[in-house]
Amino acid sequence: MPASISRSTYAAMFGPTTGDRLRLGDTDLIIEVERDLTTYGEEVKFGGGKVIRDGMGQSQRTRADGAMDTVITNALILDWSGIYKADVGLRDGRIAKIGKAGNPDTQPGVDIVIGPGTEIIAGEGRILTAGGMDAHIHFICPQQIEDSLHSGITTMLGGGTGPAHGTLATTCTPGPWHIGRMLQAADAFPINLAFAGKGNASLPAGLEEQVRAGASCLKLHEDWGTTPAAIDCCLTVADAMDVQVMIHTDTLNESGFVENTLAAIGGRTIHAFHTEGAGGGHAPDIIKVVGAANVIPSSTNPTMPYTANTVEEHLDMLMVCHHLDRSIPEDVAFAESRIRKETIAAEDILHDMGAFSVISSDSQAMGRVGEVITRTWQTAHKMKVQRGRLAEETGANDNMRVRRYIAKYTINPAIAHGLSHHIGSVEEGKRADLVLWTPAFFGAKPDMVLLGGMIVCAQMGDPNGSIPAQPFYSRPMFGAFGGALHASAVTFVSQAAQADGVGERLRLQKGTLAVEGTRGIGKADMKLNAHRPAIEVNPETYEVRADGEILTCQPLAELPLAQRYFLY
């Protein structure tokens, strides 16, 4: 006869199930399990006296007969598409199946086969998310990659060549020679990488050669001159070669205002960086572009969320990042024109409304590369505290808000940059770039990061201990070394470079994948973040209105996922 056990006992053994709720870290965000794809009474679990043993939950089937390489058991999947529990089967570095794992010879309803060649990762009581994507990287130093990976980011996209002054200010890897060297350098790192060429030119030849060399996208930056002519030329090349264009507009309004920039864009797809404006862009009203159908608006994390310290720290950051001089009044005025508490406050609310679609870092160039995920969830917490539950929520949970915010650093940047056929969600057929979290540490410290189905970093204790013992901290694992690194991570390039055999030409050890589908998309393609309010900015007070409503909120003095999580 069937046995009954309490919900708490079940959750302790197999993880939460349908209707159970749990808190994310020390935030005020509560998620509820929407459905459970496992079968009560037939759950699989590894360990002494448990289910996954020969002839029980483990079948005799070989890999050739369909057995998985790895199964993550009883995981609580947190994805833009939903919050649900399932077993996840991995094969050949990709997500082969999401459903019910086990032995089809002894158990009903099994669609994920466990065999003698299957490794098990225990997902009970853990949250499983897609690896994050940071789409605004200044490649100033290689050490950024470790900080980013260990925070839960598995794909980094941006530009640079190291601590050259062009890179310190702009996310561009300029020219075929530098692009080639950075593609070769990418072979050393256990993370997916993609590089942006410089998009500032008035004639196409200099841009086309960068795309053919391997640039996956092009960046227009005001420090190189984001004029209407450069915007038009860059977008024309991008449309012809299917790469995305990112734009940092003209803060000083020297070559036109936001309306002139939108006219130069001409309805074509573009990814607008730090659309609030503190990171740069038409002062004071670049934020208006969140209402444009063809613009994908994103934020960088130094303004996210708005706190008691946000405004104060930004002036110094600006002076350093843009090679400014405090002794020159015009340089100081330039910096001060970009820091507006009114637009920074409005940014939080526009994210909560789903009007801003992406969050990224702006690494070492006014952003913190290891805090994209943390600051996303701090912002979601702040908005719940200040604005209450979203009107779209059903039940005693924050599922809709949580799904909206996770989309900002997973699926939406992947769609924007033509990578969503490979990454961005927990979905069958996509790369097994996955992150496991203990709920109490969600958003702060991942338990484990998988890249291409192999563990590349994890919380690990004393290597000399008889068991993994405290202190635990995130360390690189076997997937981050040797040939496994090259088999697990990939480098994203343009279709033109892929067709030209860029991997063979540069003797790359990592595989390359081509971006595709970057043109003709827009705000409507941003999952759960497609809202297009009409934005007005008062040019004297900087007051922001969305569809006539004033957008303002107070800075927080204390945040979750902060100092208590980072004592060491």
Curated annotation (Swiss-Prot):
Gene Ontology BP terms: urea catabolic process
Cofactor: Ni cation
Residues reported to bind Ni(2+) 1: H136, H138, K219, D362
GO CC aspect terms: cytoplasm
Residues binding Ni(2+) 2, per UniProt: K219, H248, H274
Enzyme active site: H322 (proton donor)
GO terms, molecular function: nickel cation binding; urease activity
Pathway the protein contributes to: Nitrogen metabolism; urea degradation; CO(2) and NH(3) from urea (urease route): step 1/1
Domain Urease residue range list: 131-568
Enzyme's top EC category: hydrolase
Reactions it catalyzes: urea + 2 H2O + H(+) = hydrogencarbonate + 2 NH4(+)
Note accompanying the cofactor annotation: Binds 2 nickel ions per subunit.
Binding positions (substrate): H221
Designated name of the protein: Urease subunit alpha
Lineage: Bacteria, Pseudomonadati, Pseudomonadota, Alphaproteobacteria, Rhodobacterales
